[in-house]
Amino acid sequence: MLELLYTALLYLIQPLIWIRLWVRGRKAPAYRKRWGERYGFYRRPLKPGGIMLHSVSVGETLAAIPLVRALRHRYPDLPITVTTMTPTGSERVQSAFGNDVQHVYLPYDLPDALNRFLNKIDPKLVLIMETELWPNLIAALHKRHIPLVIANARLSARSAAGYAKLGKFVRTLLRRITLIAAQNEEDGERFVALGAKNNQVTVTGSLKFDISVTPQLAAKAVTLRRQWAPHRPVWIATSTHDGEESIVIAAHQALLHQFPNLLLILVPRHPERFPYAINLVRQAGLSYITRSSGEVPSASTQVVVGDTMGELMLLYGIADLAFVGGSLVERGGHNPLEAAAHAIPVLMGPHTFNFKDICARLDQASGLITITDAATLAKEVSSLLTDADYRNFYGRHAVEVLYQNQGALQRLLQLLEPYLPPKTH
């Protein structure tokens, strides 16, 4: 009964969704494009019979990069279709994989749209990153006997409490899933408490630890650092949200009194906020360039606004230390491990609930510095820039946490083998 009500409500609110897409399209025109894909209509052919992977956020897409590359290496004859929900996620997939994968939007959770989609790609296996539990998608896959794996699965106490209110509906939903590969024991226990069977849940660890700085990326970062700031200190503030850019800029202005040649790389989380961040820098009276301009910072450039997609790992490689945003405002923070992979100190605000386990491990190992405002941010950045030993201490411990917790990728790949043809590599 609840399933029918859910589906009926979803059909009823479609006009509101169209209005929302149109309104969002004012700032981000890509939201007004490719509406057909959201209902299972595609203008180009898609190769069927492969692996489908869905990631809703940019962070999930980044975590999926090593997994997709490993699957392509092991099963080169199987097409991989990566689905997202937003233009930002779409851009990230295209910049990460190019033509190596097929990319489309996942249709809304409407039975007819999903049937058109599944008829088109007819996957052998479906992977959903983290916790995107779409009832009609799960039901359609179950009906077609297509294995469904929730990879890198996580479930916060708050989300679990919300799902628990739905009782049997959620239990039925979970038992239609083939395998839940949980990030840690707590996540696994929450899925079981909601109704998943013990043999459905396996703890694999977090895929977010299985990132690495390739030799090619490291070489590119060294070259860019020589071009941009061969004799200047550099710090980076990434994935910033509304309210954080002003804090970062205030800290940078304070730091310039002590380090007149200090360069800040400022990377807002969402592309539609690039113009807003640029305006804040301009209002602060700071000399700036944008990454998209292709210009090289001059000796007088004080800020580079990172307004391109898919370059975050490269930009981390230029910096001496990093502040990771979404953490000074209540957004739960973003992934600190991308900075840690470069063995640089990581600073975050107190709001890190999206990465609670990862941040706890970094904090316990002296790989994370917590700040609360512009003053403490400026103070810690100053200390790190002044003392190379202090800076190296935090950078070394951060990357050690990364290395010590790797292995989730290999464990997940082994779990997927029964659902795929024999690997060729």
Can you name each region flagged by the protein language model?
Residues M1-H425:
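Nucleotide-activated sugar donor-binding and catalytic core shared by glycosyltransferases
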